[in-house]
Swiss-Prot record:
UniProt organism field: Drosophila melanogaster (Fruit fly)
Pfam families reported for this sequence: Ets, SAM_PNT
GO BP, sorted A to Z: border follicle cell migration; cell differentiation; cell fate determination; determination of adult lifespan; dorsal closure; endocytosis; epidermal growth factor receptor signaling pathway; fibroblast growth factor receptor signaling pathway
Gene this chain is encoded by: aop
Protein known as: Ets DNA-binding protein pokkuri
Biased composition annotated in UniProt, kind: Low complexity: 205-240, 506-539
Length: 732
């Protein structure tokens, strides 16, 4: 690796061997010379540290300072109507022509300031410089930095300068670190060839040296792709070694540079981006800048010759590297494209799942990683999903994946999953292991099994997307329409929307042909749906005993009261009796008691027909019992003659869970019915209605037992032909 030439710095205190001079200077830089230190302290503070950033006013300030400081003859300031960039382009002869007798002094002072600014930026990129007007910390505090040649660029009077100084600006604006981009996806690999990151050695590369000596390279990774570019590090008092990584791979001489440039290298594989070099200084090491004490004339000529030679060699090497990089990138891209085409031809055949087949293996012996781009998965998607699947789903969610398998027009996956009742959304997983394997391929998770997939199914229980059908293995039911699920951005919002849907009631079913059990939508009861829901509903399983008529239930209750005495006034006892009453008479009633807001025709119902209203929970949330499991959802057993609950209705705040507690609304009769009741009862009534259609009034809570000793529960849908005396026997 070629050594980068460094400007010679003369040590005033030590006369060392020139061979080891650069190493000693690098490891322990001397203090700045007194002449330059005095010059820096005397300079006006308004002048930027880099003379190339000076404006016209700054140039005039500098000239006036030199005239005053060095007692020079008067200058013709009209000959220096230029900015700092143009002033730095003037040679010694130009200064001598414009101001005879003072041109050499002005040229030498200007060169000292230029070299000092170079040293600050090359050797101390991470030095904590005090933020002054000469060393601004913010890149926005001074004009934009022009593209300028580095130390190894030809000087201003060199013929190479006009055509190559913009290219060299990349080395001058070298950043200090390399930022790695995220791992490449299939999209980036398929659309663009792979590109290698810039190598950042652990220990830094070459150290700067004098014109006659060479700098030793510290231990570290050697970058063979660009011999002229090197890394440099300066060790401060804290021992840190900041890295300097010059940018390479410059393809054009334009001054408009992108924020990041990438180049392919054979020595590394990956993607990296070089951030733009900020004109700021971070805290890494204290400033210790080796500065020229004075410049000898013969050194100036040596520097010019070395700059020109190194620049020409660097340009040739960069052109060769660019040609090699372009050829390598083209070959790599062509090879990658061929591999991609082969994989596209082989993948659809292998993605067709066979239940008896082993793990899907690529020709190279590795596992298939499921494609993630639509263009890469286009053929395989036709094997998985129906052609009329809705956009923006792609089966990436489990419920959508199951829907697309179930709705396949050719029923190719009926041996894995099949509908049991499409109208109500009930389906069965025929082959759990095969379905989990197919889901693992879809999710690029080849170790997927049914136990892992069932976790997602159990999560769907909590958000009311699915529920498990009791009495049959691997049988589930959709509780929400796919269109509704696709319109929900965040699936966790389903927990919040559950109380608004009737507290446990489920919305419309897929296909929209029928309603789910417990649906809040108004729908006439059907005897077939009654028997079906008694088989499927986990909230109210059907009784295995034969149905009992209401008179028989009343007789059993009266016999129990006669045998064991009058029932106690405990609220828990009353609710246990009422819950048993409703549970035993569930088969005799028309609709199941867990169907809220069910509308029955007035022509069939008569005055004794009642309707459900939404359940009132103690905590006001419909998800209070969801954590207990799917069998612990609340059941609505309250009845009312109105379709919606009024504000003055009281409901016992109990939920039918595994404990057997239920929420029951108490009904009182009209005055002509209470007159026939036992004399021991004197219930307090609200405003009564004259019509027979309004058969209930506001209930009383259990803590007011003195006013209403034993309220009478009513079944949700009593037949008009049955006598009401059977209910009164329960009070005796």
């Amino acid at each position: 690796m070629s050594k980068m030439k460094m400007l010679p710095v003369q040590l005033s205190l030590n006369s060392l061997n020139p061979g080891i001079w650069s190493d000693v200077l690098w490891r322990c830089p001397p203090a700045p010379s007194s002449q330059l230190a005095e010059l820096k302290t005397q300079l006006p503070p308004s002048l930027p540290s880099d003379p190339r950033l000076w404006s016209r006013e700054d140039v005039l300030v500098f000239l006036r300072f030199c005239v005053r400081e060095f007692d020079l003859p008067k200058l013709d300031f009209d000959l220096f109507q230029m900015n700092g960039k143009a002033l730095c382009l003037l040679t010694r002869a130009d200064f001598g022509h414009r101001c005879p007798g003072a041109g050499d002094v002005l040229h030498n002072v200007l060169q000292m300031l230029i070299i000092e600014s170079h040293m600050m930026q090359w050797h101390l990129p991470n030095s904590p410089v005090t933020p002054t007007s000469r060393y601004p910390l913010s890149p926005h505090s001074h004009p934009p930095t022009p593209t300028w040649p580095p130390l190894n660029a030809p000087p201003e009077n060199s013929p190479f300068h006009s055509s190559a100084h913009s290219l060299a600006g990349h080395h001058f604006m070298a950043p200090n670190s390399v930022t790695l981009s995220p791992p490449p996806s299939v999209d980036s690999q398929a659309s663009s060839p792979p590109q290698a990151p810039y190598q950042n050695g652990g220990a830094t590369g070459a150290a700067p040296g004098s014109a006659g000596g060479s700098a030793p390279a510290a231990g570290g990774a050697t970058n063979t792709s660009n011999p002229t570019s090197s890394s440099a590090s300066s060790t401060g008092s804290n021992g840190s070694q900041p890295n300097i990584m010059p940018m390479k791979g410059i393809s054009s001489a334009s001054s408009n540079h992108s924020d990041s440039e990438e180049e392919y290298s054979e020595t590394s594989g990956g993607v990296s981006k070089m951030p733009p070099a900020p004109l700021s200084y971070s805290t890494a090491s204290p400033p210790g800048t080796p500065i020229l004490k004075d410049i000898k004339p013969n050194w100036t000529q040596q520097l010019t010759n070395s700059f020109v030679n190194s620049w020409s060699q660097q340009q040739q090497q960069q052109q060769q590297q660019q040609a090699a990089a372009v050829a390598a990138v083209a070959a790599q891209a062509q090879q990658h494209q061929l591999q991609q085409q082969q994989q596209q031809q082989q993948l659809p055949q292998k993605l067709t799942l066979d239940n008896t087949a082993g793990p899907v293996v690529t020709p190279a012996g590795g596992s298939i990683s499921a494609p993630t781009t639509p263009s890469y998965m286009y053929k395989a998607k036709r094997e998985f999903f129906p052609e009329n699947s809705e956009p923006n789903t792609n089966g990436r969610l489990l419920w959508d994946f199951l829907q697309q398998l179930l709705n396949d027009r050719n029923q190719k996956y009926s041996d894995l999953i099949a509908w049991k009742c499409r109208d109500t959304g009930v389906f069965k997983i025929v082959d759990p292991a095969g379905l989990a394997k197919l889901w693992g391929i879809q999710k690029n998770h080849l170790s997927m099994n049914y136990d892992k997939m069932s976790r997602a199914l159990r999560y769907y229980y909590r958000v009311n997307i699915l529920r498990k059908v009791q009495g049959e293995r691997h049988c589930y039911q959709f509780l929400r329409n796919p269109t509704e699920l696709k319109n929900i951005k965040n699936i966790s919002l389903l927990r919040q929307s559950t109380p608004a849907n009737g507290n446990g009631g489920s919305p419309s079913m897929p296909q929209g042909s029928s309603q789910a059990p417990g649906s809040p939508a108004g729908q006439n009861w059907n005897p077939q749906q009654q028997s079906q829901q008694q088989q499927q509903s986990p909230q109210r399983p059907a009784s295995r005993n034969g149905p009992m008529s209401l008179p028989a239930v009343a007789a059993v209750a009266a016999a129990a009261a006669a045998a064991y005495g009058p029932p106690p006034t405990s609220p828990l006892f009353m609710h246990a009796i009422n819950g048993a009453f409703h549970y035993l008479s569930a088969a005799a009633a028309g609709p199941p008691p867990n169907s809220p807001a069910l509308n029955t025709p007035s022509a069939v119902g008569g005055p004794d027909k009642f309707q459900f209203h939404p359940l009132k929970l103690e905590n006001g949330s419909g998800s209070g019992s969801e954590s207990a499991g799917e069998d612990l959802k609340p059941t609505d057993l309250s009845v009312s003659s109105k379709s919606t609950a009024t504000s003055n209705e009281d409901c016992y705040p109990l939920i039918r869970n595994a404990d057997g507690l239920t929420t029951i609304k108490l009904i009182r009769y009209n005055e002509h019915q209470v007159a026939a009741s036992p004399a021991g009862q004197s219930p307090k009534h609200d405003d009564q209605q004259a019509g027979a259609s309004n058969a209930s009034s506001s209930p009383r809570p259990m803590d007011q037992a003195s006013e209403q000793a034993q309220p009478v529960p009513m079944e949700s849908d009593c037949n008009g032909g049955e006598s009401e005396d059977s209910f009164r026997h329960m009070q005796q």
